[in-house]
Amino acid sequence: MLYQSETLQLHWLENGIAELVFDAPGSVNKLDTKTVANLGEALNVLEKQSELKGLLLRSAKTALIVGADITEFLSLFNAPPEKLHQWLVFANTIFNRLEDLPVPTISAINGYALGGGCECILATDFRIASPEARIGLPETKLGIMPGFGGSVRLPRLLGADSALEIIATGKDVTANDALKIGLVDAVVDPEKLVGSALTMLKQAIDGKLDWQAARRPKLEPLKLNPTEAAMCFTIAKGRVMQVAGKHYPAPLTAVKTIEAAAKFGRTEALNLETNSFVPLAGSNEARALVGIFLNDQYVKAQAKKLSKGVAAPKLAAVLGAGIMGGGIAYQSALKSVPVIMKDINENSLDLGMNEAAKLLNKQLERGKVDGLKMASILATIRPTLDYAGIERAQVIVEAVVENPKVKAAVLAEVEALIGEDTVLASNTSTIPIDQLAKSLKRPENFCGMHFFNPVHRMPLVEIIRGAKTSDKTLAAVVAYATQMGKTPIVVNDCPGFFVNRVLFPYLAGFGMLVRDGGDFHQIDKVMEKQFGWPMGPAYLLDVVGIDTAHHAQAVMAAGFPERMNKDYRDAVDVMFDNQRFGQKNGQGFYRYTQDAKGKPRKENDEQVDKLLAEISQPLQEFSDEDIIARTMIPMINEVVRCLEEGIIASAAEGDMALVYGLGFPPFHGGVFRYLDTLGSANYVEMAQRYAHLGALYHVPAGLRAKAEHNESYYPVSAALLDVSTNQPA
């Protein structure tokens, strides 16, 4: 053994060939600050070996390196910029030393080589992969860009076009695609990976492969003439702005950095990369996006803990077909849980089966399933007009019309037919679970399971705990949601639960703004373009359905009359009274026609302004700041109340529910991250200016206390101040 640390080992293989093996504690290798320092120490030993002829780099685990340790990111980002800069220079010196070894080097890639793992293999002369390998630089998805030379080496290895695509999108590539673009030199069966890597390395040692020629382009300027460069980078910048927009600066920064570095060799190009990385790392967007990644890990860990030792059901059932029931049945069948789909109406069953078939057809078109697989999945959905076989289902999801009497009757009816251990769940969006539980003899076996539309696309499932819901019931439903590929978040019962409870104050703020003379077109534009919502409030209401929103609004007003009751007609009332129900009947705040693919196309409708004139002040222009404040303050206050009342268990779960359930702009990170970025004292001061508008704008006491004590919702990560001093001996 030449060198051994907690994260990697260096030893001789044969005849002057050394092997560097990444083998950190735990299930995966990460390129954390400790591993980077250990790599430097290993190279320090290696550089002293006069008999060294070649180096093979591999992993002892099922993946090479999954990336940096993202749990360290916020601490790194909180370091003073000059400290972070020093550490990046230190880290890049190590990768340069790997690249500059006076012998050929090769990486054997099994599983993932992402982020820093990809940058590590780029520093070797050759790369060989097994078929399941995936290679990529996902940093831009986290609001940053490659920082260990990825933006320098990848374009010089592949050419600018392929490299820009990988870096700007953050998508990884398969082993076969990597071979096509020149990212790897060969793809071999897993059992032959190390042997083939060794063979290739020996060929390089014997002069049969020119390892110096393989290395040279990575040290030199990018080979592009001025015309090619102008075209390549102009097109890339245009695409990035179109896809990422102004709220996500990392992809454009990466493209501009690669462009600026194109005319330089490695040293100057790496300096430019570091100079671009540091400001991105200090940005609010990076903190928010890294926060989402960490929150996602936390939420998934909570689900795993809640359902520990509980298997997903072998058979499920959905009561109520149609689009929603069909969507739930499809998702269940797709993820290998057979499902009974029961309805009292043959047409609804047809609609449900057609929805499942349509979604499977899309999978077929994309090559995700073949015809045989599609048929076998569809065969695991059993449509029925009666309850035959329902007693065999372990979890039953009620998804009938959003009417408390109908839901209660259906739940009581099915409970009489099933065993004492069968779990019942209601896919209700607003009706309190405890209200529905009154119709049941075994309320401990009952909870809410709120799916979001469209089911196949929306990652969140709200699991609602009633007063009598047992832990066993929660565990079964969380296990089922997880098996379905969803992110379950457990919330406590109240009208609207969490997501809809906080959505309707936002929509109420919109309604008041229109009442006071706000133009809904301008409001939508500001909330989409400036704040970053995927849809403005008027457009969202059209998509949800004005009739659905009108009904839910009444439920919320009854549940929280002091804040959500209103003594005036608003824009939703006007649309509802005029039977403008949104996309479902082609007219709401906007008019809808179908495009060539049959998708709804939004158009302005002059009639709407005339209709709204009866309930609103004369049109006036509000500032962007006013529009954002008047719509967002009610939502933010309600989100905070939900945490203070224990409806949600943590800021992390609240923020993920908003991002996954409502499409809250990820670059803000969720309401709690947004508040921390804004500063609670600044928020309270801003909200105070709108307090005259009513109870929705009154800041909760807990948030006022946080503002007084200068507290945040997320712990502030201590800066890693000493990372740049971890120099090899």
Curated annotation (Swiss-Prot):
EC number from the UniProt entry: 4.2.1.17, 5.1.2.3, 5.3.3.8, 1.1.1.35
Site residues (Important for catalytic activity), renumbered to this chain: 119, 139
This protein's UniProt keywords: Fatty acid metabolism, Isomerase, Lipid degradation, Lipid metabolism, Lyase, Multifunctional enzyme, NAD, Oxidoreductase
Residues bound to NAD(+): 324, 343, 400-402, 407, 429, 453
Residue runs in coiled coils: none
Region Enoyl-CoA hydratase/isomerase: start-end pairs: 1-189
Region 3-hydroxyacyl-CoA dehydrogenase: start-end pairs: 311-729
This protein's pathway: Lipid metabolism; fatty acid beta-oxidation
GO cellular component assignments: fatty acid beta-oxidation multienzyme complex
GO biological process terms on file: fatty acid beta-oxidation
Residues the entry annotates as binding substrate: 296, 500, 660
InterPro entries the UniProt entry points to: 3-OHacyl-CoA_DH_CS, 3-OHacyl-CoA_DH_NAD-bd, 3HC_DH_C, 6-PGluconate_DH-like_C_sf, ClpP/crotonase-like_dom_sf, Enoyl-CoA_hyd/isom_CS, Enoyl-CoA_hydra/iso, FA_oxidation_alpha_subunit
Pfam family, one: ECH_1
Catalyzed reactions: a (3S)-3-hydroxyacyl-CoA + NAD(+) = a 3-oxoacyl-CoA + NADH + H(+); a (3S)-3-hydroxyacyl-CoA = a (2E)-enoyl-CoA + H2O; a 4-saturated-(3S)-3-hydroxyacyl-CoA = a (3E)-enoyl-CoA + H2O; (3S)-3-hydroxybutanoyl-CoA = (3R)-3-hydroxybutanoyl-CoA
Active site: 450 (for 3-hydroxyacyl-coa dehydrogenase activity)
GO molecular function list: 3-hydroxybutyryl-CoA epimerase activity; delta(3)-delta(2)-enoyl-CoA isomerase activity; enoyl-CoA hydratase activity; long-chain-3-hydroxyacyl-CoA dehydrogenase activity; NAD+ binding
Function: Involved in the aerobic and anaerobic degradation of long-chain fatty acids via beta-oxidation cycle. Catalyzes the formation of 3-oxoacyl-CoA from enoyl-CoA via L-3-hydroxyacyl-CoA. It can also use D-3-hydroxyacyl-CoA and cis-3-enoyl-CoA as substrate.
Family: In the N-terminal section; belongs to the enoyl-CoA hydratase/isomerase family.
Alphabetical list of NCBIfam families matching this protein: FadB, PRK11730.1
Subunit structure: Heterotetramer of two alpha chains (FadB) and two beta chains (FadA).
Name of the protein this chain belongs to: Fatty acid oxidation complex subunit alpha
Species the sequence originates in: Yersinia pseudotuberculosis serotype O:1b (strain IP 31758)
Gene designation per UniProt: fadB
